[in-house]
Each structure stands twice: as structure tokens, then as C-alpha cells.
């Protein structure tokens, strides 16, 4: 049934612009260039001769900055740094511009269902038994998420030690290029009214700001349903000083350990043909390698490069460059639970538009519809359907591996929905429970082992119980009766439906739906907002420099001990711009021009 594919896709949360403000006077988009920008090319094109034009001193083929990961933070960071310095971005995935499963809202779930080697998302399952995904595409998580855009609150900015003035300047830099005001669907309007009815007040209208009450947030989907990703922020770049290599998988960061402190000299990466290359960092003062590979990729890369817990590095025979027991520690994921709401009639597709920001530290959102049609499918895989029986268009009683495969073959372009409806979700802000990340092997292409310890702390579980009670009130509110005809007596039926949906690999108590605590444990999933692993004060300094080594920073969500705002992508992109400006000003002062 469509429930499983649709639910998994959104639970894993996580275009072409009609007018580009940034591109005026900057990089012109080539009509026939599948990579859109002339500075983007495949990793196999890298050579000493081709990179020498970016040399900062005219003597060797080196770069002032090498950014590992062209994601939500990496793209705006690279675009900003390129205003004054030579920058090389190494992205392990491809481009989003010609990928229909990334570009169109109606294909949101299909893009996440694609688990092929060239997919924009790489699936993994935490040791908690919860399905998850990490981006593998230029633009990062902004290419595979639900598109909701909302800023962090002022308290987060203060705790981060950021300059409030520069933060306020950096958010609009992102918003001008890729963010839009959504056109509310009827269901999202119903959610808005229901939240107000049950007391999530006041109504704050359409705003990017994080304020208590009910509001409408921004979206990176335009009115035509096309996604605009962080990759489009590269339109701000100086094309003469930026080079972006796709399908460039960094193997490790290279250090010179002959001095008193390890000093970064470059990186080794593999191209799409399997050939290895070494990119060199300029010897100029201030040159750096910047890790922007996300909360999974950045701690993994540090350990593969010899920075991390000594015993773990020695276990895998990785030469120890710097012992730091905190690498990979402090991992957290905001637990999400949902109540599935069947509908009497087909519902227009919508991703996150309306959000209720409660004072109990819980965010309430909703998503509806299935959106996919036979014409919209470009690559269809079903979410690991052959192994985990999650293929959504097969009725539950028929969902066996052999039946699933036969169904895919027989009905690849003739899919229909076995479930019609939507779900209301609650995300727990500021979880206390913490986990860890560790290497499985030394192959960077393989996922590390990740544990989040959902609800290990009793306070997290109690807050989830309160949140589910709130969501139950929302779905039984007067405003939702027109859609669901669900009264208070039917709530447990919906809870039972939610538990039975095969949305994780955790043991379930199917006969205990009256226990809200058990419901939380049974139905926990991710909303893609995992963070930690390279925390400030433990692995990096407040300015994101890696402690104990020279010429290395980490700028991404791995440095956060909490997820900013209702959804973090706005702050991730803002941080890329913010840190880029800070770095330029540190090196050039008033001459930076930003």
C-alpha cells in the first residue's frame, strides 16, 4: 500500500529557478550543460595541469580551500569563499539538476525509494532498528528532504556564540535565491485551524522566524512543485575561483606529522572510475581543508584520517594522527512519531507547510497525499522492498518478497494506491538521549555503525507521551471531522494502524496501543535531523577548527548538540554563508568585501 512508501519517504526527513537574483553578473547558466555551471565537472577530469589555473601562488597546483562535501552547508560556504580565494569542492554524489526524482515534489518519495548506487540518498539503519538516510548529491540534504524552511530561534544563535547581526544578514542571502512561500492545501489549512483549536496559539501567519504558536513556514519548492536546493546557491560563486568535482569520494585527509602539531597538506580522493588523486592545499597562511560531510560523514572521515578514539583506530589498523575520544560521540536524533489518518477521499499532496511550535518542546507538522503518477516515475525501486517487504502498493497480506519482486516487474508503470490519507507527526525537540558512531571498516563508501538511543532517557519518553496526546486531540478536533470522521473513540484504532505499519525494525507490542509510552517506542522513526559527532569544545573550537591539528575545520551539523529550529536546513545553509564570511573577514579584514 502507498502508506509504506509514502510514510518511509517522509519519515526519512529528510529545480530550475525562473529567476535567479544571484546569477546576475555571476556565472551564466549554460542551456545545454547538464551540470548547469561551468565550474562543475566529473572527478576524473582532475589533474595537475587542469588545477594549476587555480593555484594561489602560481607555483603549484594547490587550493586555498578544499571543501569535503557539497551539501547544505558546503555549497554556500564554497560560494562565499570563492569571492576571494581558490576553492575546490569534492562531492561524492552527482548533480540534482537533471534528476527528476529530486527536482519534483510529486517524486519526493520515489527519490528516497531509490537505493541504487547512483541514488541521491544512501540508506542506513541505526542499531536502534530505525530506517534513515544520508544525502549523496550536490546540494546535500536539501535535495532529498521535505523542503520545509524555518530559521533557528534567537536562543540557539546565542548558545552557538554567533554574531546576531551577521546571522540576520546570512539568512536572507539564502532566502533570496531558493526559498518560497507555500500555497496552502486544504489539509494544511485544516491542520492550522486544528492546532489553534487545541491551544497551540497564537497564529503567527507566514514567517521564517521560530516563534511559539502556529505558523506557516517557507519551502524550497516553488509554485510549480520544483525543488530549489543548496546547489543553486553556487550561483553566487566566482566561477574563476571555484571548481566543483562530482563523484569525488574522499578517502582520507593527509597530514604532515613531522612538526609539533599535525598539519593538513591535502586530501586523497577517488573518482567515478576508481582512480585515486591527491588534491593539495596551498602553503599560504590561512589555507584549510573544511569538512562539510554531515553528522555521519564528518566524524567518519576524521576517524578514517586518523583522528578519533585510539582503540577504535588501532582495531582497524588506522595510523593514529591524533587521539580524541570524543569523535563520534554525542550523536542524537530527534525522535518522531506519527498518527496515520485515513481519509474518505483522495487528498492533494503536500509536504510540510504548517507547524505548531509548542511550549513543551514539541513540534507538530503534517504531510498528505501520495503525489506519484505513472508519468512521474523515472526510476522505481521500492524502499528496499525485496528484503524488507516495504513496497507500498502491495496490500499487506500479499507483501512477501517473491510477490513484491513480481509486482515490481509486472506493474512498474501501472502503480496504484492501496492507502489514501495522511499523517500528523510530532518531533521531539532537544532530546536528552545520546548515542555514538563507530567505524565498521575502513571503506568510506560503507555506512558506519550509528546508535541514537531513542527514548533512553525517561524525560524524552514522557515528553513523547504528552506529544501523542496533543496530536490525538488534533486529529479528533472539529476541523478534521470533515476529512476523517474520527472521534475520540476511534483514536486507538488509528494508533493501532500506526503501530502495525512496518516503518521500523523495532519489536512491537501490537496489543498494547493504549499505552502511549509503548506507542512511542514502537513507532519511533527519524525526521532526518540527526546531529553531533564533532561537538564544539570536544572535537572543534567555537570557530569550528579541529582541536589539536592545524588547517582543518568542520562546518556542518556534526558540530551541533541540538537541531536548530523546527527543521534545520535553513540554519545549515545560513551557517555555510555565515562561516564563509567570518573566514574571509578574519583573513582579509575590510578588504574581504562581504
Swiss-Prot record:
Expressed in roots, leaves, stems, inflorescences and siliques. Found not only in epidermis but also in all sub-epidermal cell layers. Its cofactor is FAD. FAD binds at residues 64-91. Keywords: FAD, Flavoprotein, Signal. One of its GO terms (molecular function) is mandelonitrile lyase activity. Changing residue 227 to C: In hth-4; fused organs and increased genetic instability. Changing residue 435 to R: In hth-3; fused organs and increased genetic instability. The keyword Metal-binding does not apply. GO terms for biological process: cell-cell signaling; embryo sac development; fatty acid omega-oxidation. Residues 1-19 form the signal peptide. The keyword Signal applies. GO terms for cellular component: extracellular region. It comes from the Eukaryota. The active site is at residue 529. Probable FAD-dependent enzyme. Involved in regulating post-genital organ fusion. Required to limit cellular interactions between contacting epidermal cells during floral development. Belongs to the GMC oxidoreductase family. Mutations in the gene for this protein reveals an unusual pattern of genetic transmission in which progeny plants inherit, at relatively high frequency, DNA sequences different from those carried by their parents. The instability observed is not random but seems to be confined to the restoration of sequence information in progeny plants that, although absent from the parent genome, was present in the genome of an earlier ancestor. This is Protein HOTHEAD. It comes from Arabidopsis thaliana.
Amino acid at each position: 500500500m502507498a502508506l509504506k512508501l509514502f510514510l518511509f519517504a517522509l519519515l526519512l526527513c529528510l529545480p530550475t529557478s525562473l529567476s535567479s537574483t544571484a546569477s546576475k553578473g555571476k556565472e551564466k547558466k549554460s542551456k545545454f550543460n547538464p551540470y548547469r555551471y561551468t565550474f562543475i565537472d566529473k572527478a576524473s577530469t582532475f589533474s595537475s595541469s587542469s588545477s594549476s589555473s587555480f593555484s594561489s601562488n602560481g607555483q603549484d597546483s594547490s587550493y586555498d580551500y578544499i571543501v569535503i562535501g557539497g551539501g547544505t552547508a558546503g555549497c554556500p560556504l564554497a560560494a562565499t569563499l570563492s569571492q576571494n580565494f581558490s576553492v575546490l569542492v569534492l562531492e561524492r554524489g552527482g548533480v540534482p539538476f537533471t534528476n527528476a526524482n529530486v527536482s519534483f515534489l510529486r517524486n519526493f518519495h520515489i527519490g528516497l525509494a531509490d537505493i541504487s548506487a547512483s541514488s541521491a540518498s544512501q540508506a542506513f539503519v541505526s542499531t536502534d532498528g530505525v530506517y534513515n538516510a544520508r544525502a549523496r548529491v550536490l546540494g546535500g540534504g536539501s535535495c532529498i528532504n521535505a523542503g520545509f524552511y524555518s530559521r533557528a530561534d534567537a536562543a540557539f544563535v546565542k548558545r552557538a556564540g554567533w554574531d546576531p547581526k551577521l546571522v540576520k544578514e546570512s539568512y536572507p542571502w539564502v532566502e533570496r535565491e531558493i526559498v518560497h512561500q507555500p500555497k496552502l492545501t486544504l489539509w494544511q489549512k485544516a491542520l492550522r485551524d486544528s492546532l489553534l483549536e487545541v491551544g497551540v496559539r497564537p497564529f503567527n501567519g507566514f514567517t521564517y522566524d521560530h516563534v511559539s504558536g502556529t505558523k506557516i513556514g517557507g519551502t524550497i519548492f516553488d509554485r510549480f512543485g520544483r525543488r530549489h536546493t543548496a546547489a543553486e546557491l553556487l550561483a553566487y560563486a566566482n566561477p574563476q575561483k571555484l571548481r566543483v568535482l562530482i563523484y569525488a569520494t574522499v578517502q582520507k585527509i593527509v597530514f604532515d606529522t613531522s612538526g609539533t602539531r599535525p598539519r593538513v597538506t591535502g586530501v586523497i580522493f577517488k573518482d567515478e572510475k576508481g582512480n585515486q588523486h591527491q588534491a593539495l592545499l596551498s602553503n599560504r597562511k590561512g589555507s584549510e581543508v573544511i569538512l562539510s560531510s554531515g553528522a555521519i560523514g564528518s566524524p567518519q572521515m576524521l576517524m578514517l584520517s586518523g583522528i578519533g578514539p585510539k582503540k577504535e583506530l588501532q582495531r582497524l589498523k588506522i595510523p593514529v594522527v591524533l587521539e580524541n575520544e570524543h569523535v563520534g560521540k554525542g550523536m542524537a536524533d530527534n525522535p518522531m512519531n506519527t498518527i496515520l489518518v485515513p481519509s474518505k477521499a483522495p487528498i492533494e499532496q503536500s509536504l510540510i507547510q504548517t507547524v505548531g511550535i509548542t511550549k513543551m518542546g514539541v513540534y507538530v507538522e503534517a504531510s498528505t497525499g501520495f503525489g506519484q503518477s505513472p508519468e512521474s516515475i523515472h526510476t522505481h525501486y521500492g524502499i528496499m522492498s525485496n528484503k524488507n517487504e516495504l513496497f507500498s502498493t502491495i496490500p499487506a497480506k500479499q507483501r512477501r518478497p517473491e510477490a513484491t519482486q513480481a509486482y515490481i516487474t509486472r506493474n512498474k508503470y501501472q502503480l496504484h494506491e492501496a492507502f489514501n490519507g495522511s499523517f500528523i507527526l510530532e518531533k521531539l525537540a532537544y532530546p536528552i538521549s545520546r548515542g555514538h558512531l563507530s567505524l565498521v571498516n575502513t571503506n568510506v563508501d560503507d555506512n558506519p555503525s550509528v546508535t541514537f538511543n531513542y527514548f533512553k532517557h525517561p524525560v524524552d519518553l514522557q515528553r513523547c507521551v504528552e506529544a501523542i496526546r496533543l496530536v490525538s486531540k488534533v486529529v479528533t478536533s472539529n476541523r478534521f471531522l470533515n476529512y476523517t470522521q474520527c472521534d475520540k473513540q476511534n483514536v486507538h484504532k488509528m494508533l493501532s494502524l500506526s503501530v502495525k505499519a512496518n516503518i521500523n525494525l523495532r519489536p512491537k507490542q501490537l496489543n498494547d496501543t493504549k499505552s502511549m509510552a509503548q506507542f512511542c517506542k514502537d513507532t519511533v522513526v527519524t525526521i532526518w535531523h540527526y546531529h553531533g559527532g564533532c561537538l564544539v569544545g570536544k572535537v572543534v573550537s567555537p570557530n569550528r577548527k579541529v582541536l589539536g591539528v592545524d588547517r582543518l575545520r568542520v562546518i556542518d551539523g556534526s558540530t551541533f548538540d541540538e537541531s536548530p529550529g523546527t527543521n534545520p536546513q535553513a540554519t545549515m545553509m545560513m551557517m555555510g554563508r555565515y562561516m564563509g564570511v567570518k573566514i574571509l573577514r578574519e583573513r582579509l579584514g575590510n578588504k574581504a568585501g562581504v
